[in-house]
Every structure is written in C-alpha cells, then in structure tokens.
From Swiss-Prot:
Disulfide bonds join C31-C40, C71-C414, C215-C465, C264-C282, C436-C444. This is Phytase A. Keywords: Disulfide bond, Glycoprotein, Hydrolase, Secreted, Signal. Catalyzes the phosphate monoester hydrolysis of phytic acid (myo-inositol hexakisphosphate), which results in the stepwise formation of myo-inositol pentakis-, tetrakis-, tris-, bis-, and monophosphates, as well as the liberation of inorganic phosphate. Myo-inositol 2-monophosphate is the end product. Has a broad substrate specificity and is also able to dephosphorylate other classic acid phosphatase substrates such as p-nitrophenyl phosphate, phenyl phosphate, fructose 1,6-bisphosphate, glucose 6-phosphate, 3-phosphoglycerate, as well as ADP and ATP. It holds the Pfam family His_Phos_2. It comes from Aspergillus terreus (strain NIH 2624 / FGSC A1156). Monomer. It comes from the Eukaryota.
Length: 466
C-alpha cells in the first residue's frame, strides 16, 4: 500500500501519576467542564447517541477510577474520537431538504413549531464546530492533569487519521495539554510542546488502523443499515403521524423524522462555543421518543461496526495489535490493516514511549473496542424493542462513542505485583475486561491481558474481507 505521512516531530518519551488541580477554561458554562464533560440538559443530551457530547461515566463505573496509593501509572495509550462537528455533506443536504419541504407545505406553524416558519438552515458540513474544538482542548487538559507525574516531563506520541476534523482535534488536544502544562508550576519549563507526530492518509489506497477503508466485503455490507431500518419502522411512523397532525399540510417519511431529531444535537453543538443553548428542535419530541432515538443510533453502530456485524470487530484488529506492541515493547505482528511501512520505523511508530494518543472516528472506535473484547458480554441487540445499558452490558453509542469520546489504556506498576497491571477506561468508566483474570479494581496482569486478545493476535476473520 502507498503511504503519505506528515511527520511533525519525534519525541523521546519515558515516565509515571496523580492529578494537578488546574482550573477549567474560563468560558465554560456551569454544566460543562474539563473533569465531567457535558452535563447540560442531561435528560436529553445523554440520549443523543453518537451525537451526544462527551460526558463522564465515572458514576457508572463498576470499579473505582482512582489509582491505588501503592501503584504508579507507567504507560498510557489514549484513543479518541474527534470533537463535535457539523453534519456530513449528505446529511446536511437531507436535513435542509426536510426543513424546506415542511416550510413549503405546512399551512400553519403553531406553538413550539413557530420557529420553523422562518428557520434558515445554516450549518456547514463535516468540520468541527467551535464547541467541538473546545472539547478537544478540554481533553488535552484532562489528560495532562490525570497523568501529571508523567506529563510534566514527557510528551505523548500523537497520531491522527488524515481527516480535517480528526487532525484538527489532535491539534486542539495539543493546545489544551500545553496550556495545562504552562499553568502547572511543577512542570518542566524547558519541555517543548507536544506536536502531532504522524498523520495517516485515509482511503482505499492506504493501510490505516485509524480509519477503515480496505476490507471490501465490510465496506459493501448493509447489515447496519438494515438493522437501523428495522427499528426505525417500529418507532418513527407514530412520531410522523403526531407531527403531521400538528403541522397541517405536511407529510413526513420515517427518514424525515430522523432528520428532524438529528437537528437537535447538531444545532445545539453549533449554536455556542460551550453548547449551553438548546436547539428548538429538541422540544419537538418527547422523552420516550429520545430514548428510542438513542437506541436507534446504538443499534446502528452495533450492527454497522460492532459485534452485530460479522466483519465489524476485525476492522479494529490492526489497532489492537499495535497496542500489544506498545504494551510489550515488541514489533507489531499483524496482517490486517496495519501500515507496515510506518510501524516498522521507530520514528513513526516508537515502541519505547510512555504516553501515546491516537485520534480517529466513532466507527473505528466501535470496531476497536470490540476487537479488544470490551463488549464481549453484549448480546445481540433487539431490532424491535429498546434495551437499556443494564441489558446491553454497558453498551450504548452515547456511552461509547460520543463526540470527543476517549479511551485510556493504562498500565501500572504496584508494589505487591511483579508484573504490571492493565486496565481500560472508556469515558471514565473502568471497563470489565474479558479474556483475563480481573482483580477487584478491574485490572489484569499485562501478559494475561495480551493473552486474552486472542482474536486480534490471530488476525480475526480478515480473510473474509476479500
């Protein structure tokens, strides 16, 4: 496969953690913070699936988040989704068309619908919103603070997929990280700012563990779309009927209903730089309907990129094998989507670093989490009935891949242990690991953790891609 890499800097990294008490960015609203993420309108915003802004799941964690006093973090791999963005180009056109049709055909716009009469669709497509940029600055600050005994003296090695919103997210993470360091009187004042070290091209011509493109059978799959269509047919017609009764002259398809619901999160994350203003589209739907919408988006990701798609998890195998290499300081062994040109070069894939941060897309994160076995306890999701997180073993799109989602794979050395221990945090939720013996703090011994990644080490079912 061909390769094009933007190599901005190479850092030498070594290190160990506690937590610097640095203040949040000054323009935060009371419900949006570095430590807890987006807690504005939680009864709504936490039901926006993959369009929900990141919010901390610490209170939902089955294990404590704190690191024991007798342990020291020695390694961290961060994996993050880009921040809040405008809709994709195709969705922007679809949303605008739905609104235009309503404006053309409705004979009256009563009450909560009044804003629609003169509404002007003005969102762009694909790019980060100002709020999305701030999310990644916050993540950089959070990462610095959480691992400050390391970050005061060490820079993370940073990679990003070559999508503008992903690359910019990585750059904003760097800004937040460095701003936090500059505000820390205990930091090394001579340590240069981190930079985005490697940008990996996207597309079918390139192997890239941070963006899926090359598994032909997977790219042609319609499993996710079919599952989403099945559930949409269950709940959307009743909503369409209600809206049509409220807006005489209007006829709405199931897709129109989903388009109008999507306008709620997308406009909310676009209106202000801290998303403190709720879009008027949000008030057009009931709490029960938002629960259904949230489940629809979870279903779509599960059957599109997760365990519900036979070729979903294998899309994350390459990254899982890179993680194994970094944890064990050994060369990458993979025959799936790893870019061997990059990973064989210590300048573009160092094995001796302490801190790593990779930036990608929501779909890739879903596949990676399944390749790591984090949701092995999640059974096939119903396509006709809403299931909550107690029924899905903690899986939901809003809990897993919201805007600015972040996973931290930590390795720690503890006084009573000869071997380092590994745990995984997804949006501040310490994950119940599968495939290895877990202690009462959610940790496995490193060698057991690696051994448990048997699906990834065997290359999954990659042969079925072609």
């Amino acid at each position: 496969m061909g390769v094009f890499v933007v190599l901005l800097s190479i850092a030498t990294l070594f290190g160990s953690t506690s937590g610097t008490a640095l203040g949040p960015r000054g323009n935060h609203s009371d419900c949006n913070s570095v430590d807890h993420g987006y807690q504005c309108f939680p009864e709504l915003s936490h039901k926006w699936g993959l369009y929900a802004p990141y919010f901390s799941l610490q209170d939902e964690s089955p294990f404590p988040l704190d690191v024991p006093d007798d342990c020291q973090i020695t390694f961290v791999q961060a994996l993050a989704r880009h921040g809040a963005r405008s809709p994709t180009d195709s969705k922007t056109k679809a949303y605008a068309a739905t609104i235009a049709a309503i404006q053309k055909n409705a004979t009256t716009f009563p009450g909560k619908y009044a804003f629609l009469k003169s509404y002007n669709y003005s969102m762009g497509s694909e790019d980060l919103t100002p709020f999305g940029r701030n999310q990644l600055q916050d993540m950089g600050a959070q990462f610095y603070r959480r691992y400050d005994t390391l970050t005061r003296h060490i820079n993370p090695f940073i990679r990003a997929a070559d999508s503008s919103r992903v690359h910019e997210s990585a750059e904003k993470f760097v800004e937040g990280f460095q701003n936090a360091r500059q505000g820390d009187p205990r930091a090394n004042p001579h340590q240069p700012s981190p930079r985005v070290d490697v940008v990996i091209p996207e597309g079918t011509a390139y192997n890239n563990t941070l963006e899926h493109s090359i598994c032909t059978a997977f790219e042609d799959s319609t499993v996710g779309d079919a599952a989403a269509d099945n559930f949409t047919a269950v709940f959307a017609p009743a909503i369409a009927k209600r809206l049509e009764a409220d807006l005489p002259g209007v006829q709405l398809s199931a897709d129109d209903v989903i388009n109008l619901m999507a306008m709620c999160p997308f406009e909310t994350v676009s209106l202000t730089d801290d998303a403190h203003t709720l879009s008027p589209f949000c008030d057009l739907f009931t709490a029960a309907e938002w629960t259904q919408y949230n489940y629809l988006l979870s279903l779509d990701k599960y059957y599109g990129y997760g365990g519900g798609n036979p070729l979903g998890p294998v899309q994350g195998v390459g990254w899982a094998n890179e993680l194994i290499a970094r944890l064990t300081h050994s060369p990458v062994h993979d025959h799936t989507c790893v870019n061997n040109t990059l990973d064989a070069n210590p300048a573009t894939f160092p094995l001796n670093a302490t801190l790593y941060a990779d930036f990608s897309h929501d779909s890739n994160l879903v596949s990676i989490f399944w390749a790591l076995g984090l949701y092995n306890g999640t059974k096939a999701l119903s396509q006709t009935t809403v299931e909550d997180t107690t029924q899905t073993d903690g899986y939901a799109a809003a809990w897993t891949v919201p805007f600015a989602a972040r996973a931290y794979i930590e390795m720690m050395q503890c006084r009573a242990e000869k071997q380092p221990l590994v745990r995984v945090l997804v949006n501040d939720r310490v994950m119940p690991l599968h495939g290895c013996a877990v202690d009462n703090l959610g940790r496995c011994k490193r060698d057991d953790f690696v051994e448990g990644l048997s699906f990834a080490r065997a290359g999954g079912n990659w042969a079925e891609c072609f």
